[in-house]
């Protein structure tokens, strides 16, 4: 349960608000641009949520608002509301506040769980109790991050890889993900095309057909399955 500080919301300068917990949130440029328009038109409607960690205010909820405000010359301060919590509680609060607002994303949940287990040393059972979820749910979210290779994880963090695409990438062995990512960037593949490429890759485990898929992804998608997997060379 959130423990709100016994004080009224207050204004803070933007540079007083830290973003160390932003690593557990997806950066979605389109959403931030939409928030900029909203702030310009209506101003700040509700306070963002912060906690104090090591003597500094750290943002827990309101990352789009802070990111948008930093890009607007007209905004130099934001109203904040503080909760009293430690680092583990802050991570749980990020999950809880977003779930209450109907804004949870599977990948963001996975990042928080990964941090609680791998950084804070909690067991999966302890994380389940902290977040009010079943252990199997925690296990699935943890696997989602741990099956994602470092390059894909980094691109997801900065918004270059969508959560939908990430769910396809984790179907592949970590060692194969970088090659598929290169194809996605080079060919500007859609999510539907990426899904098809991952399906093909798993159906055709041989080196030659997989090289063909990497070199000619759209052509491979248009070929009959038997041709793609057995021949793996261009006609």
What kind of feature is each model-predicted range?
Residues 108-119, 139-235:
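Amphipathic alpha-helical extensions and coiled-coil-like segments
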Residues 24-26, 67-147:
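Amphipathic, charge-rich alpha-helical segments that serve as recognition/docking helices
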Residues 1-83, 94, 100:
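Short, charged/polar connector segments at secondary-structure boundaries
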Residues 31, 35, 65, 91, ...:
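Helical mechanochemical/support elements of P-loop NTPase systems and associated helical scaffolds
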Residues 53, 133-134, 161:
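An acidic- and aromatic-residue-enriched active-site/binding cleft used to recognize and process polar
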Residues 47, 77-81, 125, 136, ...:
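A local structural micro-motif
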């Amino acid at each position: 349960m959130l423990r709100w500080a016994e004080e009224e919301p207050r204004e803070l300068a933007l540079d007083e608000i830290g973003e160390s917990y932003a690593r557990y949130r997806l950066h979605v440029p389109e959403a931030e641009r939409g928030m900029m328009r909203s702030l310009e038109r209506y101003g700040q409607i509700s306070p963002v949520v912060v906690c104090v960690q090591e003597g500094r205010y750290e943002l827990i909820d309101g990352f789009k608002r802070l990111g948008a405000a930093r890009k607007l010359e007209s905004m130099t301060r934001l109203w904040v509301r503080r909760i009293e919590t430690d680092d583990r509680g802050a991570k749980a609060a990020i999950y809880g506040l977003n779930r209450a607002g109907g804004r949870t994303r599977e990948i963001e949940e996975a990042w928080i769980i990964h941090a609680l287990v791998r950084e804070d040393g909690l067991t999966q059972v302890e994380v389940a109790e902290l977040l009010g979820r079943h252990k199997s749910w925690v296990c699935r979210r943890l696997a989602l991050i741990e099956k994602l290779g470092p390059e894909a994880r980094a691109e997801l963090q900065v918004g270059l890889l969508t959560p939908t695409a990430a769910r396809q990438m984790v179907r592949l062995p970590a060692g194969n993900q970088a090659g598929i990512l290169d194809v996605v960037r080079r060919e500007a593949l859609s999510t539907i095309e990426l899904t098809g490429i991952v399906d093909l890759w798993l159906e055709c485990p041989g080196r030659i057909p997989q090289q063909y898929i990497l070199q000619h992804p759209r052509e491979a998608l248009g070929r009959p399955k038997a041709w793609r997997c057995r021949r793996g060379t261009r006609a």
